[in-house]
Structure formats: C-alpha cells, structure tokens
Amino acid sequence: MHGFVCGQRSSFGAVTKATGPIMMVHFDYYPKDLPRIHALEHRLESAIKLAGVGELGETEFHLDGNDGYFYMYGPDPDRLYVVVSPILKSSRMMTDAEVTKRYGSRTETFVIHRGGLQ
C-alpha cells in the first residue's frame, strides 16, 4: 500500500490517537476531486469541533489507485457518526463509501448510500 497523507488535523489534544482512529471512511476519488475533498474535510472538521465529539485526523490518498481515507478520533464512534453522517451523505463523492467504526477490538463496517440507508 503506497500513499500519502494530506494534512494532519489536530484541533484537540491527543484524543485517542495512541489507539488509532475510532472511525475510518474509505472512498473512491479522482485527482480532479481533490478541491471538493478538501472542502468536505473543512465541513467535517468544523462539525466535529462544534459538537465536541472528537477530531478529524489525517486524510490519506493512495498513489497507486484512487482510494482515499478520512480518519476520525474521539471517545464515542456512534456520537461521531451522528455528527458527520449528514455531511457525508450530502456529498456525491461519498456514495458507496465504506465506514468502519471501532469499539475497542470490535468493528462495525457498512456502506453509505444516498437516499437514507446507513
């Protein structure tokens, strides 16, 4: 896996970075989408900060394909998802994105669909 990290967001201290992200969003992108992805990052970061549910971490883009990842940190993946899901669902780029929420050693993974499912 080859990639690069775009931006290291850090609006809160070390929330739970020692144990890794509690939520990851895997999405497809094309290089022409980067400005829209950066705008989406700003919306996510603002909403997470305003709600006080954690922080948006780094965004990763794989150089050998069109895979992108948002990493999010905080104490409760469910509260975090409640805050970010309307923003993710509003973006066509996030249609069919895969969300993984971590609960300690257990994970829950599902796909974002436009039109209300998950």
Report the location of each language-model feature.
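Short, extreme N-terminal segment that most often corresponds to the first beta-strand
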Residues: 2-6, 10-32
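Short amphipathic alpha-helices in soluble, non-transmembrane regions
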Residues: 40-44, 83-89
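Conserved short beta-strand edge segments in small beta-sheet-based binding/regulatory domains
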Residues: 90-106
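Short, low-order "capping/linker" segments at domain edges
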Residues: 106-118
